[in-house]
Amino acid sequence: MTKTKKRGEYPLFLLMEISQNKTFWYNKYMYTKNEDELIALGEKLGHLLEKNDVLILTGELGAGKTTLTKGLAKGLDIHQMIKSPTYTIVREYEGRLPLYHLDVYRIEGDADSIDLDEFLFGSGVTVIEWGHLLGENLPSDYLELEILKRDEGREIVFHAHGQRAIELLKGLTDGV
């Protein structure tokens, strides 16, 4: 199902598009061969991001969640060094839009321990590592990126929840 690709293009497989209870799920797969391609993918997505967009990053330790966030930051014209928020819970960066980079693994689903609404409904983009742990505290519209280790590369499974997330995913994959 792959086509001949130029360097830097990503294979893409459409899985499904369904509507259920006014929630849209739109899933796609991509594969990046190395860290540079993962950052480039993040940068492309970062260019598409708008105020109040929410991204959920899932994947085991070392899968590339913070690496992908480095690319997102480049796409948002952020020139600061991007670090994992594992121990600080939240890191904020300034660029074209503010980037709120959260790691909620250590709060064990206790969204009240941080002012989650401040980030979700603030003036920027919110990226949440381990965001699936927040369960019902997640907004209704977000793009989840599941990052899976595949040898030296990464398989990225996109799960779009809501209309804006579908728009982001379609914008990201146009022409791929």
What is the predicted function of each stretch?
Residues 92-132:
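Conserved nucleotide-sensing/catalytic segment adjacent to the nucleotide-binding pocket
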Residues 65:
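Conserved lysine of the Walker
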Residues 74, 118-176:
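Short phosphate-coordinating micro-motif centered on Lys-Gly-acidic
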Residues 3-15:
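Positively charged N-terminal leader segments that act as targeting/secretion signals
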Residues 27-42:
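N-terminal pre-Walker A segment at the start of P-loop NTPase domains
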Residues 62:
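Walker A (P-loop) phosphate-binding loop of P-loop NTPases
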Residues 78-93:
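Short beta-strand-centered segment that lines the nucleotide-binding/catalytic pocket of NTP-utilizing
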